[in-house]
């Protein structure tokens, strides 16, 4: 099986000398679903940002789809980022309808109008939002807002999907529904890495889980 992410000897230290990530080694196969679980301020969001090319590694190597993130030019890094779907923690949609949010994202990525319309409908169907496409995003429930964030992240057929705290603000049943949706999006070809404080819903049992503790990754 092809490798989507290969991290070797990754270190990251803040400007005031705090070691956040220390000697991280991580391998994610193409088409795999991985949960990274760790407490607040453990470096989960930072690790996702590094994997997504939002900033270069200070030390160590990150390969994404065979490309060395640390050696990419700013232009090439931007190209890579545009091929990665990302749902940030505390995602806030635009003050538009659900459909308009997705359409705006697709148009901003260079899709022509007709192509953007087709992709938007597919993304809304995949995330269970087609019935709410005309609803203002501000009126969505917490779970449906996560659905919209995922629709935005996958609408342009990314190589990789990175999700930061998808269960934040959800009750136990909603966490289970969000987890099942992530699993459905991953099924087939999409590689997914999701970071969360946990605990994971019961429906996540059987998925690969690593824990980020004291700056180090440990397989569960």
Set out the residue ranges of the language-model regions.
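Hydrophobic anchor residue at the start of the ABC signature
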Residues: 150
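Helix-to-loop junction immediately C-terminal to a conserved catalytic motif
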Residues: 52
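Catalytic Walker B motif of ABC-type/P-loop ATPase nucleotide-binding domains
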Residues: 161-165
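Conserved ABC ATPase "signature" region
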Residues: 115-132
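Conserved catalytic motifs of ABC-family nucleotide-binding domains
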Residues: 90-100
């Amino acid at each position: 099986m092809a490798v989507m992410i290969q991290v070797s000897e990754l270190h990251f230290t803040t400007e005031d000398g705090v070691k956040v990530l220390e000697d991280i080694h991580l391998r994610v196969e193409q088409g795999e679903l991985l949960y990274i679980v760790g407490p607040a301020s453990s470096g989960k969001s930072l690790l996702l940002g590094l994997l997504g090319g939002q900033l270069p590694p200070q030390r160590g190597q990150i390969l994404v789809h065979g490309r060395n993130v640390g050696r990419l030019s700013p232009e090439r890094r931007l190209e890579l980022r545009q091929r990665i779907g990302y749902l940030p923690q505390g995602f806030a949609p635009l003050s538009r309808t659900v459909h308009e949010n997705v359409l705006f994202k697709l148009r901003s990525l260079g899709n022509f109008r007709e192509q953007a319309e087709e992709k938007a409908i597919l993304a809304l169907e995949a995330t269970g939002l087609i019935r709410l496409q005309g609803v203002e995003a501000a009126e969505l429930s917490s779970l449906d807002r996560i659905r919209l964030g995922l629709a935005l992240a996958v609408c342009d057929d990314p190589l990789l999907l990175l999700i930061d705290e998808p269960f934040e603000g959800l009750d136990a049943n909603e966490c289970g529904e969000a987890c099942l949706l992530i699993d459905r999006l991953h099924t087939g070809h999409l590689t997914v890495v999701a970071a969360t404080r946990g605990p994971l819903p019961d429906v996540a049992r059987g998925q690969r889980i690593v824990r980020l503790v004291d700056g180090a990754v440990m397989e569960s």
